[in-house]
Amino acid sequence: MTEKLQPLRGMKDLLPDDYKVHDYIINKARDVGVLYGYKQMSTPLVEYTKVFNRSMGESSDVISKEIYSFLDKSNDFVALRPEFTACIIRSLISNRLQHKLPLKFFSTGPVFRYDRPQAGRQRQFHQLNYEYIGAKGAITDADTLKLAVDILKALEIEQDTTLELNSLGCNESRSVYQQKLVEYLNDFKDQLSEESKIRLSKNPMRILDSKSETDQKIIANAPVLSEYYTDESKEYFEELIQYLDILGMKYSINPRLVRGLDYYCHTAFEFTTKKLGSQSTILAGGRYDGLAKIMGNNDDVPAIGFAAGIERIALMREYNISEVKPVFVLPIGKNNICYALEIVDKLRTENIAIIIESLGKIAKRMQRIFNENAQFIIFIGDEEQANNNLKIKDLKKAEEYIVDFAKALELLKK
């Protein structure tokens, strides 16, 4: 018996109804981005693995556990992109766009992570991604956060999310804090989860993200980053808060919200929801001024960005999306098909969506049309062809018309 082929675990087909929702989300988000000056770009699905090793760190969960990396036929290690930011910065450097800064980029498409599949978390999923490159300062961060809020509003889910906000401070702040955090955690080293024991030597701030209940109890009394802010870091965060208050934005300061990579600084944020269980993060981002230099640029480039999961957004609410309903043309006999094709072609040039139903018996064709919930059917038989007319049936009004092409056009465009 022939094996029944299935998609890979954690990867799903996007059927027309799914794609309709995805397109709606993407178009809404793109339209808001345009109002903020963002321009769309795309990068390859496949990059050299070292692009992500540099950007995310070899000890990160994504690189150590989740990345799809393999040796290609040229003996190069390549990877399916697990996120967009590294790809965008790689593109900035390889296309020598530094002289055009500042730049605002919007991207969308699939990303891949070898994770345990569950609702809202698949191994292939789709993201909206925004990067504001070459602009520094709290005003830039406030503008980026307002963009995120406006996107969620356009998608009618902002009211079901909470903006969690923190400042990672400057390099000096984080360096002092990390030292104090390690000193604190060393006293509990034997009680930490196995994963956190590994992180303690490689990336201690990531322990603050631990899902282990034991780790969380230890973390509850750990030093807080804000206690070690320099004057510069305090002023930056206070300025950001001032701008958010002026914009009337609601937020919750979460002192445990961190990023474990050295190139992140100052603003970090997440929009979370209670509607999706454990997959509570809808949109997340932060400032990453140090990434470009790590990836080979001569200098640091200030940048801030965020990504949002399309599948998770789609789970947040039901979207009633109106569609263009096609007009169906039904030639009665085989000798009517040529005339029907002429009519179909003329109507499409007038931007009317048309489907020609010519296969099978009339009853079966009519059933297929009814299943599509169509409004108009154009019948073309010998009489219509001889008189150069069209018989149009309006299924919603239960009315029938026999008209010439000009009148038919007028009727169908109402």
Curated annotation (Swiss-Prot):
Catalytic activity, EC: 6.1.1.21
CDD domains: HisRS-like_core, HisRS_anticodon
Sorted UniProt keywords: Aminoacyl-tRNA synthetase, ATP-binding, Cytoplasm, Ligase, Nucleotide-binding, Protein biosynthesis
UniProt GO cellular component terms: cytoplasm
One GO MF term: ATP binding
GO biological process: histidyl-tRNA aminoacylation
Disulphide bonds in the chain: none
Enzyme class: ligase
Gene3D superfamilies: Anticodon-binding domain (3.40.50.800), Bira Bifunctional Protein, Domain 2 (3.30.930.10)
SUPFAM superfamilies, sorted: Class II aaRS ABD-related, Class II aaRS and biotin synthetases
InterPro entries: aa-tRNA-synth_II (IPR006195), aa-tRNA-synth_II/BPL/LPL (IPR045864), Anticodon-bd (IPR004154), Anticodon-bd_dom_sf (IPR036621), His-tRNA-ligase (IPR015807), HisRS-like_core (IPR041715), HisRS/HisZ (IPR004516), HisRS_anticodon (IPR033656)
Catalytic activity as recorded in UniProt: tRNA(His) + L-histidine + ATP = L-histidyl-tRNA(His) + AMP + diphosphate + H(+)
Location within or outside the cell: Cytoplasm
PANTHER family membership: HISTIDINE--TRNA LIGASE, MITOCHONDRIAL-RELATED, HISTIDYL-TRNA SYNTHETASE
Subunit (UniProt): Homodimer.
Stated family: Belongs to the class-II aminoacyl-tRNA synthetase family.
Protein name: Histidine--tRNA ligase
